[in-house]
C-alpha cells in the first residue's frame, strides 16, 4: 500500500495519494511503518504547498514517542541543540567524521528519514524549526553513526553555521564532509539533496560560482535516477539561478527554466510552478521576448495572476520571495528604478524564507 501511495505521488495523483496515506496512518502499528507513512505524507504536503500541514504531521509523529516540540521554537532552543553538536564532536576533527560507523539500528534509520524529509517544509514554515531539525539530524549522526541522511544533514548545518551561528569556516568543512560521505562511503540515497544544497548554497560563497553550477547539474541527474520528486524540482530551479549567475547564454538558461516549469506542471508541484514561472518570465524579458522590456507579462505568464496566487496562499511565501526578486531584476535592467525599489521592499519582508 505504501508503494502504491508513492507511485501515486510520483505520478501527481495527489488526491489519491493523500487519501491512501490518511488510511494507512490509522493502520500503521510498527515504528517502521509509521515512519514510512509519515515520510510520504511530508513529501506529499510539500508538493501540495502545505508546509503547515507537513509540520503538523511531523510534530504529531514526534509526540507518538513522547517528544514535544513547538512549531515555532525559540533561538535558545536552537542554540542548545547546536551547542550539543560541538559537545559530541569533542576533540575530533570534522573531517574525521567520514569514518564514523554506519548506522545499523533500523529505528534510528527510520527516524533519520523522517527528520530529513521535514527539512524543506520546516524551512518554508519557520526558520528556527528548520534549524532545530538540522541540528538534531547532526547530533543523531554523531551519537549513532552515519547514514544517507547524514550527508544531507552535514551540508545543511554548513548552510546554517555561517549566517546563523557566525561559524563559516567550520560550516564549509561540514559541507565538504557531506559530499565526501556520498562519494567515499556510497551513501547515495540523498545524493541529489546533498549536491544541490552544497552546490547552490555553500560552494558559491567559497569558490567560483561555476563549480557549484556543475554540482547542481549532477544533482538534477541524480534526482531523476533515484526518483526524488521534491529535489528533482528544486534542483532545476537552483540550476537556473546558478546558470544566470555564471553568465551562461540566456537561450540556454531559458531552455533550463522552461524544462523546470514543465516538470512542475507534470508533477502538479505548485511551489515549483511559481518558482519556474518567474524564472522563465525574467529570462524571456531579458532576451527581449516579452511585449514590454522589463515586464515579465506575455501570453503565458501574468505578474498580476502570480501576485493574486501569493496573496491567497501564505505557504507559497518562498516562491513569492523569488518572484519579487526576479521582478526586481527585470525592472532594474529596464531602468525602471521606482518599480525595482518597490519589488525590493516586497522581497525584503520575505527575506526569512530564502534560507539561512
Which residues fall in each region the model found?
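TPR/TPR-like alpha-solenoid signature
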Residues: 2, 39, 116, 135, ...
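Residue at a conserved register position within TPR or TPR-like alpha-solenoid repeats
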Residues: 8, 38-45, 121-122, 154, ...
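Eukaryotic all-alpha helical interaction scaffolds
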Residues: 8, 25-28, 45, 65, ...
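TPR-repeat structural position
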Residues: 14, 51, 127-128, 147, ...
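Alpha-solenoid helical repeat scaffolds
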Residues: 22, 52, 56-59, 135-138, ...
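Residue register of alpha-helical TPR repeats
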Residues: 36-39, 113, 152-153, 193-195, ...
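Amphipathic helix-loop-helix modules that constitute alpha-helical solenoid scaffolds
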Residues: 46-132, 244-326, 330-335, 352-356
Amino acid at each position: 500500500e505504501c508503494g502504491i501511495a508513492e507511485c501515486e505521488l510520483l505520478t501527481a495523483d495527489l488526491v489519491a495519494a493523500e487519501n491512501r496515506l490518511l488510511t494507512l496512518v490509522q493502520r500503521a502499528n510498527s515504528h517502521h511503518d509509521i515512519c514510512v507513512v509519515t515520510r510520504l505524507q511530508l513529501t506529499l504536503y510539500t508538493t501540495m504547498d502545505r508546509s503547515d500541514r507537513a509540520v503538523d504531521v511531523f510534530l504529531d509523529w514526534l509526540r507518538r514517542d513522547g517528544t514535544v516540540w513547538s512549531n515555532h521554537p525559540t533561538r535558545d532552543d536552537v542554540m542548545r541543540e547546536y551547542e550539543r553538536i560541538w559537545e559530541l564532536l569533542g576533540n575530533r576533527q570534522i573531517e574525521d567524521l567520514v569514518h564514523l560507523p554506519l548506522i545499523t539500528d533500523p529505528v534510528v534509520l527510520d527516524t533519520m528519514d523522517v527528520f530529513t524529509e521535514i527539512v524543506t517544509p520546516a524551512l518554508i514554515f519557520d526558520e528556527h524549526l528548520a534549524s532545530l531539525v538540522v541540528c538534531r539530524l547532526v547530533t543523531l549522526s554523531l551519537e549513532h553513526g552515519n547514514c544517507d541522511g547524514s550527508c544531507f544533514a552535514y551540508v545543511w548545518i554548513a548552510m546554517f553555521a555561517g549566517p546563523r551561528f557566525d561559524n563559516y569556516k567550520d560550516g564549509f568543512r561540514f559541507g565538504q564532509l557531506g559530499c565526501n560521505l556520498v562519494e567515499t562511503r556510497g551513501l547515495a540515497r540523498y545524493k541529489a539533496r546533498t549536491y544541490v544544497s552544497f552546490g547552490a548554497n555553500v560552494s558559491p560563497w567559497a569558490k567560483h560560482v561555476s563549480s557549484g553550477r556543475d554540482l547542481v547539474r549532477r544533482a538534477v541527474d541524480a534526482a531523476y535516477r533515484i526518483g526524488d520528486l521534491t529535489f528533482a524540482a528544486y534542483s532545476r530551479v537552483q540550476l537556473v539561478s546558478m546558470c544566470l549567475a555564471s553568465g551562461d547564454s540566456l537561450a540556454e538558461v531559458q531552455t533550463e527554466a522552461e524544462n523546470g516549469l514543465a516538470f512542475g506542471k507534470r508533477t502538479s508541484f505548485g511551489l515549483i510552478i511559481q518558482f519556474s514561472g518567474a524564472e522563465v518570465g525574467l529570462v524571456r524579458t531579458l532576451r527581449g521576448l516579452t511585449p514590454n522590456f522589463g515586464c515579465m507579462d506575455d501570453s503565458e505568464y501574468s505578474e498580476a495572476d502570480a501576485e493574486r496566487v501569493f496573496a491567497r496562499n501564505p505557504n507559497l511565501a518562498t516562491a513569492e520571495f523569488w518572484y519579487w526578486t526576479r521582478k526586481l531584476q527585470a525592472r532594474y535592467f529596464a531602468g525602471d528604478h521606482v518599480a525595482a525599489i518597490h519589488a525590493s521592499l516586497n522581497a525584503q519582508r520575505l527575506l526569512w524564507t530564502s534560507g539561512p
